[in-house]
A protein has these predicted regions:
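N-terminal secretory signal peptides
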Residues: 1-8, 12-24
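N-terminal (or domain-start) structured segment
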Residues: 29-126, 165, 190-213, 305, ...
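An extracytoplasmic/periplasmic, membrane-proximal ligand-sensing/linker region
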Residues: 42-44, 186-187, 227, 273-334
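Stable alpha-helical elements in mature extracytoplasmic
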Residues: 56, 60, 64, 89, ...
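Sec/Tat-exported extracytoplasmic proteins
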Residues: 68, 72, 97, 105, ...
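Hinge/capping helix and adjacent helix->loop/strand transition within the periplasmic-binding protein
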Residues: 95-101, 115-202, 250, 255, ...
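A ligand-binding cleft/hinge motif common to bilobed small-molecule-binding domains
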Residues: 110-119, 183-187, 213-247, 323
Length: 334
């Protein structure tokens, strides 16, 4: 089956999403001291988190906010505004004063929602400016221990011999794991039935109970079950193997395949570039600290710390990629 992405587009996506990382941010970023941003911030700062408290993304938000608070000598308040697949919180950021005192955290829904939801109260590109992609969240495919396959190649072969027989669960329709599964189906040329759940836990329950064949989920969410022998790790979805683990990637069977959940900071589009650069530079400095990197990696993430321009480009490339997957798979928001 013809891949959804030409090889050139894939290389651009991989470049935007991983290779830039920490090594090149300083050269590409505008000066943080330009335009009088050196005394930023002069007042308390609000970090909008568009999902409920708890989980790895919230942990990273709080870790970074505490470090920025120390650097800036101003409170950095984490304000939770969940709902509508993150659209409520993102809209709050889009409509906030463009003074740098309000910025927000986003995940992959930021790039998916323009295609998944019929109407958004903001324009993802026109109303919001990327500050930095903080990290990628590692994703994985797991199976029941008694599944008749143990590798991705065996899974694909089994699925082709038994079309429509396999079922897989995800934390919800339109989630990055769901989109990754649909992309895998199309690139590998097989079919399986999707069962969306309200979060990871019920999907795990169904797999453990033998009522599902597979689950696509964040790596750390399923790792304890794999270690206990209650689930079988088939593959991870990132470009490279998860550091410290020997589990194979999908890309080792399907070169160029790469899906992970992004985590980043955005600001109102009219925020002065020097202020955006200041937030980016200080966030990147925080992420360069060995202890912070270790704690982010403990949440199942790979540190990226891209520049504002790199993050904007990556979001737009992800919007293009997922728009096509959503249209071809007929995916709708729950």
């Amino acid at each position: 089956m013809k891949p959804l992405l030409p090889s050139q587009d894939r290389r651009l996506l991989l470049l935007a999403g991983s290779g830039l990382a920490l090594s090149g941010f300083a050269a590409a970023a505008p000066s943080a001291s330009a335009g009088g941003a050196g005394d930023y911030p002069k007042a308390p700062v609000k970090l909008i988190v568009p999902f409920a408290p708890g989980g790895p993304t919230d942990t990273v938000a709080r870790l970074i906010s505490l470090k920025l608070q120390e650097m800036w000598g101003q409170p950095v308040l984490v304000d939770y505004k969940p709902g509508a697949g993150t659209a409520i919180g993102v809209d709050f950021v889009a409509k906030a004063p463009a003074d740098g005192l309000t910025f927000g955290m986003v995940n992959s829904s930021f790039a998916v929602n323009p295609s998944l939801r019929k109407s958004l109260p903001y324009d993802t590109v026109k109303d919001l400016a990327g500050i930095t992609q903080i990290a990628n969240l590692q994703l994985a495919i797991v199976a029941r221990p008694d599944a008749p396959f143990s590798t991705l190649a065996e899974l694909i072969a089994y699925a082709k011999r038994n079309p429509g027989k396999l079922s897989y669960g995800t934390p919800g329709a339109g989630s990055t794991t769901h989109l990754g599964a649909e992309l895998l189906k199309r690139e590998a040329g097989f079919d399986m039935l999707h069962a969306p759940f309200k979060g990871s836990a019920p999907a795990h329950t169904e797999l453990l109970g033998g009522r599902l064949d597979l689950v696509f989920d964040p790596f750390l969410s399923v790792l304890p079950y794999v270690k206990a022998g209650r689930m079988k790790m088939i593959a991870t979805l990132g470009e490279k193997r998860v550091p410290g683990y020997g589990y194979p990637t999908v890309a080792e069977i399907l070169p160029g395949f790469h899906v992970s959940a992004l985590l980043g900071f955005v600001a109102p589009r009219a925020t002065p570039p020097a202020v955006v650069a200041k937030i980016h530079a200080d966030t990147a400095k925080v992420l360069r600290e060995p202890e912070m990197r270790r704690r982010v990696e403990e949440q199942g993430m790979e540190v990226v710390a891209s520049t504002p321009a790199q993050f904007d480009a990556f979001v737009q490339s992800e919007m293009k990629r997922w728009s096509r997957v959503i249209a071809e798979a007929g995916i709708q928001a729950e």
